[in-house]
Amino acid sequence: MAVGAQVAAPRTRSPRLCCALVRRLIVGNSGSGKSTYATRSAAAHGLARLELDSIVWEPHKVAVARPAEDVRADLDSFLATHDRWVIEGCDGDVVLLALHACTELVFLNPGVAVCLENDRRRPWEPHKYDSAEEQNKWLPYLLSWVEEYYTRDGPRSYAFHRQLFDDFDGAKREVTEGTVDP
């Protein structure tokens, strides 16, 4: 061990943090690490977790949007049911609907190369696709969509996420590299 190096004590869950009001909203491109970070946050802090894809898209129908009123009803139900939560997604218009209730906004922005690599290594998502083969069939489309993040317009674009983040007055952080502690 190097001179002056410190060994960190094992982490324990702080009662203050354990019971704190945590309402974390995570936004970013596909492959930016939103789901991974949300899962870790939920486990570390005992939070309910909502993946926006689960309410925005028709189950097992790739890129078929549900009616906006159904999405809003499901989001409102989640917010009313859970005091402590983490919500993640790239759907900026839906993120806007939950923004008033969050205690922290996290913008995961690691760059296109990281997002592409993460999407290429993504395991099968049975809640989205009927099979790994079906998921792999859609991969070229997803990779193309990820590459367009910084140039496209609309609520799933970098420009929208950047504006949302910059305009938010509450606690927020942008992560551009590395991993983030839950």
Q: How would you name each of these model-derived features?
A:
Residues 71-113:
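Glycine-rich phosphate-binding loop used to anchor ATP phosphates in small-molecule kinases
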